Amino acid sequence: MSLSTIICIGMAGSGKTTFMQRLNSHLRAEKTPPYVINLDPAVLRVPYGANIDIRDSIKYKKVMENYQLGPNGAIVTSLNLFSTKIDQVIRLVEQKKDKFQNCIIDTPGQIECFVWSASGAIITESFASSFPTVIAYIVDTPRNSSPTTFMSNMLYACSILYKTKLPMIVVFNKTDVCKADFAKEWMTDFESFQAAIKEDQDLNGDNGLGSGYMSSLVNSMSLMLEEFYSQLDVVGVSSFTGDGFDEFMQCVDKKVDEYDQYYKQEREKALNLKKKKEEMRKQKSLNGLMKDLGLNEKSSAAASDNDSIDAISDLEEDANDGLVDRDEDEGVEREYTFPGEERTKGEVNENSAPDLQRRYQEAMQQVGKTASSETAENIAKYIRN
């Protein structure tokens, strides 16, 4: 069985790090210890042993001092620095894939620093292109007892799913404090969610959501997210007691199968399309360069000239084809003979035939004029092209 990657994402205070600790303990109890990676550079202490820890190579406070950044800017910069070595991280994980079945990754609590940053996309894409990857979106169940907060969390989960395009499991954490049954019901029953909105209005009066713009907006969003809910696996867990982690791992196995069946093919299509577009862009740039240099026009003009003429000497040879053959070549018996200079002054013989020399000279002048004219025209055409 190939190694699968679980990327844990959640808002600050959702219990993400505690979830990682309990998941690590659960898998070790099952005799399948995971390969653990910590990507939170600002955490002071992690309650689990990490095989790769971003804090070993990047000092968060030094980044703040050297680059004069605030907390969130330092987290983004730390992730940027770490992402430059992501190929080495992938290589290390690949070397251990025969010893581990799962790789679990903890991310910063400032969720936007990871999800919406370029470094977060690089890290996610690198793992997703090498291993079956699943997103575990951790939700604080007690905080989501309000319909407004619940809807906001679901919209955030939807945006993460759209951004990563990876299988997602919505994990309702802290079920030891508040059961997640109400959330599962809201996701599957629209009327139940409407009743919760009305109840919120009754409890909070004018501050509730039972009427007006907010009520209409929340109802519309719940209808819109109905298709989104159908693609999710939802599980309730308690990081404090350990309840629900068996169900969570079953969901992971299911999502890994979905990754191999659907997401992997879609990702390959997307990569091939991207590669094809890049090749087309390079070819277009090359054609533009050739056009700017004028190489295409010159080559096409030379090709057309080669089809019609090869050289100017060929024109002259073709023009000479119109010359009149000598009488000897034609086998005609000469009608007169003049010795010396008299060859050009003789009289016509007894048959009173036309002066053959005059006819010969006229023919030569006419043929020479025609050949020269054709040669001049062809030369002019060659120069113009």
UniProtKB/Swiss-Prot annotation:
* GO cellular component terms given for this protein: cytoplasm; cytosol
Q: Does the keyword Transmembrane apply?
A: no
Q: Which residues bind GTP?
A: 13-18, 173-176
Q: Which locations, inside or outside the cell, does it occupy?
A: Cytoplasm
Primary location recorded for the protein, binned into one broad class: cytoplasm
Q: Which InterPro entries match?
A: Gpn, Gpn1/Npa3/XAB1, P-loop_NTPase
Example GO molecular function: GTPase activity
Q: What function does the entry list? A: Small GTPase required for proper nuclear import of RNA polymerase II (RNAPII). May act at an RNAP assembly step prior to nuclear import. Promotes sister chromatid separation during anaphase.
Record note on quaternary structure: Heterodimers with GPN2 or GPN3. Binds to RNA polymerase II (RNAPII) in a GTP-dependent manner. Interacts with nuclear pore protein NUP133 and nuclear export factor CRM1. Interacts with PCL1.
Q: What is this protein called?
A: GPN-loop GTPase 1
Natural source organism: Saccharomyces cerevisiae (strain ATCC 204508 / S288c)
